Amino acid sequence: MAPKAPNYKLWAKMILGGAGIAVGGPAFVMYISPTEEELFKRYNPDLQKRALESRYERQKEYDDFVTELKKSAKSDKNIWITQQIEAEKKEKLARQMASANAAAEQARMQEEEHAKIEQMRREAGLPPTR
């Protein structure tokens, strides 16, 4: 039996259908998706006011994040490794600050305790300890 001739019409329909789905689907989603301004207009007034008030902080956080990413990207190491190293450095610094604050707080509490003892000694008519 002789081989069948290819059905070019069927192939053309399938290619056009696939292209229509591959291009038309995302285009349709973009067409029906609301823009940020349209979403913002749908907020109630309280949410709009809060969003406007916190816009600067969110923008600053995003800019800081992008700056950190750019710094990490300049390194020869993998970006995830450099970010982890930076996070560990920040955590270590925070722990050091916390321990320094705790030591200062402890010293302040000891001073207060000593001052209370001295006050009680004065009230009792005893000489100071120092």
Curated annotation (Swiss-Prot):
GO cellular component: mitochondrial inner membrane
A Pfam family assignment: CBP4
Top-level division of the source organism's lineage: Eukaryota
Keyword Magnesium: no
Region (Disordered): 99-130
Membrane topology of the entry: Single-pass membrane protein
Intracellular or extracellular location(s): Mitochondrion inner membrane
Family listed: Belongs to the CBP4 family.
Annotated source species: Pyricularia oryzae (strain 70-15 / ATCC MYA-4617 / FGSC 8958) (Rice blast fungus)
Transmembrane segments: 14-34
GO BP term (any one): mitochondrial respiratory chain complex III assembly
Bias kind Basic and acidic residues: ranges: 108-124
Alphabetical UniProt keywords: Chaperone, Coiled coil, Membrane, Mitochondrion, Mitochondrion inner membrane, Transmembrane, Transmembrane helix
Record's function text: Essential for the assembly of ubiquinol-cytochrome c reductase. It has a direct effect on the correct occurrence of the Rieske protein, core 4, core 5 and apocytochrome b.
UniProt-recorded name of the protein: Assembly factor CBP4
Record InterPro entries: Cbp4
Coiled-coil parts of chain: 86-125
